[in-house]
Amino acid sequence: QFDKETMILHHDKHHATYVANANAALEKHPEIGENLEELLADVSAIPEDIRQALVNNGGGHLNHALFWELLSPEKTEVTSDVASAIDEAFGSFESFKDAFTTAATSRFGSGWAWLVVNKEGKLEVMSTANQDTPISEGKQPILGL
């Protein structure tokens, strides 16, 4: 459970700053477009003078946007399709929770724990530092904390 102050800080300060800074970087190179998922999927193609700003702030925006999208005031159950995929990948839901908790609590400093679909179409748990996004590693995030 999250407290109100933490959510306000992350939404109104952190996320808003990531959006503003990503937009400022994109304004310097309108020719590359504004699709952050496409841009962050090929970081080396981002112009060098804005690359780190987009990795940090574009990643921060995408990470937080997914977090807000998945947040719910009500407890929800895992769908049968997701439960089956988790069982296949991790052996059980408990094993998945253990792996996800380890990814979240073993990250030194700031970062994210993720449930992603990897390049082979399989679920995996991973962690990224700061505002790095799994998209830059060719993985599709489906849960982030």
Curated annotation (Swiss-Prot):
Pfam family, any one: Sod_Fe_N
Matching InterPro entries: Mn/Fe_SOD, Mn/Fe_SOD_C, Mn/Fe_SOD_N, Mn/Fe_SOD_N_sf, SOD_C_sf
Record field: catalytic activity: 2 superoxide + 2 H(+) = H2O2 + O2
Gene3D superfamilies per record: Fe,Mn superoxide dismutase (SOD) domain, Iron/manganese superoxide dismutase, C-terminal domain
Residues engaged in binding Mn(2+): H10, H64
Cofactor annotation comment: Binds 1 Mn(2+) or Fe(3+) ion per subunit.
Binding site for Fe(3+): H10, H64
Cofactor: Mn(2+); Fe(3+)
Molecular-function GO term, any one: metal ion binding
Family per similarity comment: Belongs to the iron/manganese superoxide dismutase family.
Known function: Destroys superoxide anion radicals which are normally produced within the cells and which are toxic to biological systems. Catalyzes the dismutation of superoxide anion radicals into O2 and H2O2 by successive reduction and oxidation of the transition metal ion at the active site.
Name of protein: Superoxide dismutase [Mn/Fe]
Native source species: Streptococcus porcinus
